[in-house]
């Protein structure tokens, strides 16, 4: 389900030019509108001071497509979590993650998530609808505006399964790249894996990074953690991943949330290494971030390092990603569209 109200945000320069011409305005107004939407982050047409006042007054209620910040919190590590209110009143979460040289935005692609992964707060809260491309782009503009600095990287790792909303996600990638100026190689699309969808994404020939959430080294455990895995075996998922690499020439990142005593045993690391043998890939290990809705535990440092060492011994490229924003419930797996 999508909200279908026409908005200006999400339109290309050509589309905006056509729109202003239909309004009886000269062609160059399209370029001005594009600049105010994507460079200046205009929230209403009334802000666009280069437009004639009489035209601005006529269009004062025309929807641009910007959200409003319903709630904002800052973690001790400077990560900022936002609850954004969409045009229809639904709430999504977005996270801004700053470092000295980067500003990364973790964007949502759906309101909620239907995948119901057992360790993830978003999946526990149910699913309402897909986001439109402009609602994804708006998240980046909102964070950019709040930090008063340019966003350098975007990860589709917020609420939702991006490949279920593939058309709008791909459209948003093109807008972020062509209209806002973020390089495609600075964009990451995450997925738990869906039949046919990885290959469909590959045929768009984007230069983004694909991050595949494995979270288990064998099929029975993966089905326990990710219910949708019942319809997509590890064998078929990895076959599609290999085909993705062949089509795009891009290395895949495999995400693996470490759950203490569940999927972090040395023999499971060996099993994972055997799965990925000969793969053009990198493994990101993510120590579990606790949520109230699940009883899993974060492994200790010894368990984490042992898992890393086993993978390295088997020639698997691996790193540990400690999530930012943990204290603000803004870390990986904690997004639930609520203030807690």
UniProtKB/Swiss-Prot annotation:
What are the Radical SAM core domain coordinates in residue numbering? 99-327
Recite the UniProt cofactor note for this protein. Binds 1 [4Fe-4S] cluster. The cluster is coordinated with 3 cysteines and an exchangeable S-adenosyl-L-methionine.
Q: Which reaction(s) are listed as its catalytic activity?
A: adenosine(2503) in 23S rRNA + 2 reduced [2Fe-2S]-[ferredoxin] + 2 S-adenosyl-L-methionine = 2-methyladenosine(2503) in 23S rRNA + 5'-deoxyadenosine + L-methionine + 2 oxidized [2Fe-2S]-[ferredoxin] + S-adenosyl-L-homocysteine; adenosine(37) in tRNA + 2 reduced [2Fe-2S]-[ferredoxin] + 2 S-adenosyl-L-methionine = 2-methyladenosine(37) in tRNA + 5'-deoxyadenosine + L-methionine + 2 oxidized [2Fe-2S]-[ferredoxin] + S-adenosyl-L-homocysteine
Which cysteines in this chain are paired by disulphide bridges? 106-332
| Alphabetically ordered keywords of this record | 4Fe-4S, Cytoplasm, Disulfide bond, Iron, Iron-sulfur, Metal-binding, Methyltransferase, rRNA processing, S-adenosyl-L-methionine, Transferase, tRNA processing
Q: What is its EC number?
A: 2.1.1.192
Q: Using the UniProt record, name the top-level EC class of this enzyme in a single word.
A: transferase
- GO MF annotation: an example: rRNA binding
From the record, what ranges are coiled-coil?
A: none
- From the UniProt record, give one GO term of the biological process aspect: rRNA base methylation
What is the protein name stated in its UniProt record?
Answer: Probable dual-specificity RNA methyltransferase RlmN
């Amino acid at each position: 389900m999508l909200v279908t109200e026409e908005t200006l945000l999400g339109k290309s320069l050509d589309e905006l030019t056509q729109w202003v011409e239909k309004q009886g305005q000269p062609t160059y107004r399209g370029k001005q509108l594009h600049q105010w939407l994507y460079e200046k982050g205009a929230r209403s047409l009334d802000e666009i001071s280069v437009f004639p006042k009489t035209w601005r007054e006529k269009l004062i209620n025309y929807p641009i497509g910007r959200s409003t910040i319903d709630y904002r919190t800052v973690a001790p590590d400077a990560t900022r979590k936002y609850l954004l209110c969409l045009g229809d009143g639904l709430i999504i979460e977005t996270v801004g993650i700053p470092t000295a040289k980067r500003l990364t935005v973790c964007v949502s692609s759906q309101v909620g998530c239907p995948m119901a992964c057992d360790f993830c707060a978003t999946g526990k809260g149910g699913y309402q609808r897909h986001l439109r491309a402009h609602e994804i782009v708006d998240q980046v503009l909102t964070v950019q505006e709040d930090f008063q600095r340019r966003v350098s990287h975007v990860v589709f790792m917020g609420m939702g399964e991006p490949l279920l909303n593939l058309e709008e996600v791909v459209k948003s990638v093109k807008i972020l790249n062509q209209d806002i100026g973020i390089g495609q190689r600075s964009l990451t699309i995450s997925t738990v894996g869906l039949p046919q969808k990885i290959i469909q994404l590959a045929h768009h020939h984007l230069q983004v990074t694909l991050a595949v959430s494995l979270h288990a080294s064998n099929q029975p455990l993966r089905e326990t953690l990710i219910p949708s895995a019942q319809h997509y075996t590890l064998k078929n998922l990895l076959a599609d991943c290999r085909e993705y690499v062949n089509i795009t020439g891009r290395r895949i990142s495999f995400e693996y949330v470490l759950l203490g005593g569940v999927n972090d045993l040395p023999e499971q690391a060996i099993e994972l290494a055997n799965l990925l043998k000969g793969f053009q890939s990198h493994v990101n290990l993510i120590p579990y971030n606790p949520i109230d809705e699940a009883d899993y535990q974060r492994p200790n440092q010894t368990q984490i390092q042992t898992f890393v060492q086993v993978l390295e011994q088997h020639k698997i490229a691996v790193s540990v990603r400690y999530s930012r924003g943990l204290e603000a419930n803004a870390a990986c797996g904690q997004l639930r569209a609520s203030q807690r």
